[in-house]
């Protein structure tokens, strides 16, 4: 059964690496189901064959962090948002636990490494397709990649996340190249892939990934040279000199090859114009509302709107993520979440460093062999962890399944790097082992049931959006109906269906008792109930209430929207339209002019305050020109 669990595990990693590459769960569900099966089989097996003892301290910190994040997600104000973090967390826990336990045998770790290299090859192939000019290419038919042209993305929707994935796998490959067991042909292939990944990171033009790569490379070099100093001191100075020459020449070549590309990135998106500082201010403002436990899972979706900085350019889109995982952790999970995350990182990094020390002081003296896959993966995992943590200062890769699961794999390698013998006796915490198995079972059940209860609804919502883009109103309606039927608690499906129904009504059909209007109002009211923090839901419901002559209730929703989006043209303009419909022209004019002062403007080509204000002036002029009624 253990081998069956590991086969499902490898398939889950592969599917997630290809499909689980964006922040929504839509394409993660197949990989989630496979990982759930792997975890369930492992749980039923209960006593797994573990070749080496894992660190109970690492397991304890991971249990505390996972338990807290899962509990906070369960108690979050918007279940649909929390679901995204919860399922990625469950997948990460299964990956972590199976890496620590069932996959502790060297051959299974090599198999995991082979899956990662397969994903690297796939990402490089898709990256070449992007580089050839087909920037919107997506591996799933009928879906398009929405990222900016000029930056490769591989399987990922966001090029920065491809950079994160490459920088993690690159150091595992570098560790295997330097200290892993294998022939010359394998090492040559690894060297080629490492260079390809370095070029790939440069072609993503992700400055955060490049920074993480540089710092990770520095740590890798220091640790590798330290190992050589402890074990093969006669080679140290030769390797140091050769390493410096290769680093300088390699860096110069990479810079020259990608110079024009990186300069173009700086021209189109200069560092001086980076808006991250303003986004970070919004995250800190949300954190201040609930410092200890945060606002809840992914509540920065709406917090980025409510606490938007006035310094952001007026036409800048909504951030949705803090572009800094540590500030996002503070905003969503508070100080408790961040402190537990730091404990997890420290425990695993310490265990990895302890293994390197044990290997050089004990294992090497016993065997006389420096080549070791365990040493290779531990060294690579430490450098990859460092690169990942640096990159996380600028990005949100832990809100995407594939990089998160890769990070969980790195932590698993560090939690059980391969200690053996009696030279090092680790602290045993028996209750922790039981808790890890219970969490593994719960996470597995969640991953198996999630695609059925939520994945089908996500699928129908995506199909409805495709139908809308193709202007197929009937198909859109059918898909939205199916989405709501599959998951009645999906606020986005409710909102989209209510909005679609409102859009079908002609002016003469917007009467209080019209059945379509009633149905639209019910959907929008349910969407607001399920997610009272999304200002667009409140605005749509206000529009429906106005059509039903429920003007006071409409005004309440408009005031709610103004609290949720205080700087936005859309919410101010909706208030003006409300007064305009009621014939209160002075209030309407004041609201339109207030909308013109908004710090967050609607996109060009969409409904704008000035267009509606002109309609108001025309309306007033027509009224004045009309002869007075007797």
What are the roles of these predicted feature ranges?
Residues 1-70, 74-84, 92-118, 176-191, ...:
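Transmembrane signal-anchor hairpin modules in multi-pass inner-membrane enzymes, especially those
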Residues 158, 277-319, 326-329, 333-340:
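TM-adjacent membrane-interface loops and short helices in multi-pass inner/ER membrane proteins
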Residues 461-630:
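C-terminal luminal/periplasmic domains and tails of membrane-associated envelope-modifying transferases
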């Amino acid at each position: 059964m253990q081998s069956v669990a590991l086969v499902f595990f490898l398939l889950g990693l592969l599917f997630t690496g290809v499909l689980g590459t964006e922040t929504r769960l839509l394409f993660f569900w197949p990989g989630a189901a496979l990982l759930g099966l792997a975890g369930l089989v492992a749980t039923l097996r209960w006593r797994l064959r573990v070749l080496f003892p894992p660190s109970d301290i690492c397991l304890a910190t991971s249990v505390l962090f996972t338990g807290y994040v899962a509990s906070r997600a369960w108690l979050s104000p918007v279940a649909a948002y929390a679901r995204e973090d919860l399922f990625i967390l469950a997948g990460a826990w299964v990956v972590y636990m199976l890496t620590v336990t069932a996959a502790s045998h060297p051959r299974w770790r090599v198999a995991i490494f082979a899956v990662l290299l397969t994903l690297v090859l796939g990402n490089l192939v898709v990256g070449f397709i992007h580089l050839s000019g087909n920037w919107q290419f997506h591996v799933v038919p009928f879906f398009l990649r929405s990222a900016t042209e000029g930056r490769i993305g591989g399987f990922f929707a966001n090029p920065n996340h491809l950079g994160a994935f490459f920088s993690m796998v690159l150091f595992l490959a570098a560790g295997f190249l330097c200290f892993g067991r294998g022939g010359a042909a394998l090492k040559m292939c690894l060297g080629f892939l490492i260079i390809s990944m370095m070029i790939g990171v440069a072609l993503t033009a992700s400055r955060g990934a490049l920074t993480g790569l540089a710092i990770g490379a520095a740590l890798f070099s220091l640790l590798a040279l330290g190992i050589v100093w402890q074990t093969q001191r006669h080679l140290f100075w030769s390797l140091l000199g050769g390493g410096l020459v290769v680093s300088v020449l390699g860096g110069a070549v990479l810079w020259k090859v990608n110079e024009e590309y990186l300069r173009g990135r700086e021209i189109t998106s200069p560092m001086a114009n980076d808006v991250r500082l303003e986004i970070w201010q919004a995250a800190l403002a949300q954190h201040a509302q609930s410092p200890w436990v945060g606002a809840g899972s992914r509540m920065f979706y709406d917090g980025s709107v409510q606490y938007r900085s006035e310094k952001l350019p007026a036409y800048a889109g909504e951030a949705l993520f803090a572009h800094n995982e540590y500030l996002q952790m503070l905003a969503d999970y508070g100080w408790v979440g961040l402190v537990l995350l730091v404990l997890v990182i420290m425990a695993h990094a310490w265990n990895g460093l302890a293994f390197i020390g044990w290997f050089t002081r004990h294992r090497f003296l016993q065997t006389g062999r420096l080549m070791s896959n365990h040493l290779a993966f531990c060294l690579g995992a430490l450098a990859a962890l460092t690169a990942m943590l640096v990159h996380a200062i600028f990005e949100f890769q832990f809100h995407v399944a594939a990089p998160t699961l890769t990070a969980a794999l790195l932590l698993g390698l560090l939690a059980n790097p391969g200690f053996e013998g009696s030279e090092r006796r680790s602290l045993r915490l028996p209750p922790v082992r039981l808790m890890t198995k219970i969490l593994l079972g719960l996470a597995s059940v969640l991953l198996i049931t999630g695609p059925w209860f939520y994945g089908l609804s996500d699928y129908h919502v995506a199909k409805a959006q495709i139908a809308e883009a193709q202007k197929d109103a009937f198909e859109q309606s059918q898909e939205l109906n199916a989405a709501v039927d599959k998951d009645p608690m999906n606020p986005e499906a409710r909102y989209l269906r209510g909005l679609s129904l409102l859009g079908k009504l002609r002016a003469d059909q917007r009467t209080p008792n019209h059945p379509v209007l009633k149905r639209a109002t019910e959907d929008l009211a349910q969407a607001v109930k399920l997610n009272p923090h999304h200002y667009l839901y409140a605005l749509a419901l206000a529009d429906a209430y106005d059509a039903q002559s429920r003007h006071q209730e409409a005004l309440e929703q408009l005031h709610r929207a103004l609290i949720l989006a205080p700087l936005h043209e859309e919410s101010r303009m909706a208030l003006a339209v409300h007064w305009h419909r009621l014939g209160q022209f002075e209030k309407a004019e004041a609201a339109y002019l207030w909308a013109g002062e908004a710090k967050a403007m609607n996109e060009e080509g969409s409904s704008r305050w000035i267009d509606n204000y002109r309609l108001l002036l025309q309306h007033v002029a027509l009224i004045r020109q009309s002869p007075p009624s007797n």
